[in-house]
Every structure is written in C-alpha cells, then in structure tokens.
Amino acid sequence: MPAVDRFRQADRNPPSTQADGLKVTVLVLFVVVFLLPPALAATLHSRNRIVDWRNADRSSAGLLPPALPQTPAVVRIFSARTVRWRGIVATHSWIVLKSAGAANYSRFDYTAWGEPIWVDRFIPDGRWFGRMPELVFAADGTNAERMIPLIRQAVRDYAYPNTGDYRAWPGPNSNTFVAAIIAAVPGMRAALPPTAVGKDFPIDCRWVGLTPSGTGIRFNLGGYLGIAVGWVEGFEVNLLCAVAGVDIRRPAIKLPGLGRLGISSTPRS
C-alpha cells in the first residue's frame, strides 16, 4: 500500500476511535475506583457485622492516657465506622480535649439524636457501637492548650446546632462538624479519612474555598461533587460523597468504602 493511502486510511476515523478509547478508559477507572472498593468493603462488613448494635461494646479502646491533673493538655480527633449498613462506606468522627491541670476529658459529638451537639455523652475514646476508633489527629502540651479555647469557640459558633439540622447525607453530620472545627482552628492540620462522608459539605455554601486544613483549595457543589487539592488533604475527588484520591505528603491512596491505604496520616502537634 502506498504511503499516501496509509496516511489517508489512518486519518479516516481517528477522532471517534480515540473518543471510544477514552470512554472505555473512563468507564474502567470509574468501576475500579468508585464501584469495586465499596463492593469489597461490603464483603468485609458482612463478615464482621454487629447484629445487635444497640447493645454493642462502647467501652474505652485504650487510646488515651488517664486524665490526671499533672498531665499536659491534649487534643484528639477520632473516627470509627458507623452502625448498621452505613458502616460499609461511612465513619463517625468526634473531638476529645483536656486542658492542662484538668482531671477529665471532654468529648464533642454531632449526632442525629435530639439536639445534635452532644458533650460527654460517650467515653472519650470509646468504641463506636462495637467499632474500633482510628486516631486522626493528635496535639499535646502548649500547642494543644492553644487550640482548646478555639475549639470550644468553634463548637459554640457552629452553624447547625439545632434539632433537625442533622442530615446523614450529604451533611451536615458528624464529619461536617469536625471538619468545620478543623477549619476554625489555625494550625490544626488534620485531614479526615475518605470514609468520613459529609466532611466536604460546605457550611458556608461557597463553591470555592480553602480546604479544612487551610493548606489547599477545593471546588465544591453542595457536598455532592467536588475536587480538593491540598498539602494535608492531598488530591481528592468527591462523587456523591464517595471520595477517592492520593496523598503525596504521606504516600497513600484513598478509596470509597476501604478508606486510606498507605502510610498513616495522623499528624502530631
């Protein structure tokens, strides 16, 4: 075949061929990133299912030292799988703090039961209805002491404090609450896990803004769709609250349902 004919044949339908190839690639990526991980998470959840969640273990997970007057200030963020089928893809987050000289911890949750902001209703590092909590953020000493009044003020100023404000999806829920506190406290460079459904709900209703850690920018459509790029958060894509992404700072991949796979993201301050 002459060279000219070969070029003519190659030029006949390249756009459609390339478009078809792109569609297949996008479809494969969608299945691998957004469908397979939740399916695997569902399988794992069924094997470790807690049947009677109302009577499930809520005892201390042993993640906090005893609260003694002589111990320094402490700030912690924990996250644990939620109850029933929602635990396949979602976690519940909360904040714990102790001032220097205090003999007890204070725990702040945001729930669907009654007035949503709950204080000291659960054991500070307790299992969440049988599910082991994960440490998300830790600060101690003078840095924690600096954060504590800012955290308390952020709780008082939270935009959704009333009965009926809670919405499991896309927010505001417990993860929205904790993300808002992170955003309100300078230096609290924490990133909630990708399974923290609701963390991307914009309480200020803005489409563009800083990430909660203040180290990046995010584009957000009501918590349903969005993209975030930040030094602490890494690169994240939010599709109907299913979050996938990568973390370069502490190498890991983030997948819906499965969560973060890689080096721990827990920073200490």
Each model region followed by its residue ranges:
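N-terminal intrinsically disordered, acidic low-complexity segments at the extreme N-terminus
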Residues: P2-R8
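Activation targets extended, charge/polar-rich intrinsically disordered C-terminal tails
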Residues: D11-S60, A159-S269
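Glycine-rich catalytic cores of cysteine/serine-nucleophile enzymes that process amide/ester linkages
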Residues: S46-T142, G164-A168, V243-G257
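Extracytoplasmic/secreted proteins, especially bacterial periplasmic and envelope-associated proteins
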Residues: H92, R146, L150, N173-A180
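Hydrophobic, Leu/Ile/Phe/Ala-enriched alpha-helical segments that form helix-helix packing faces
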Residues: V96-L97, V155, I182-V185
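A structural motif
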Residues: D140-A159
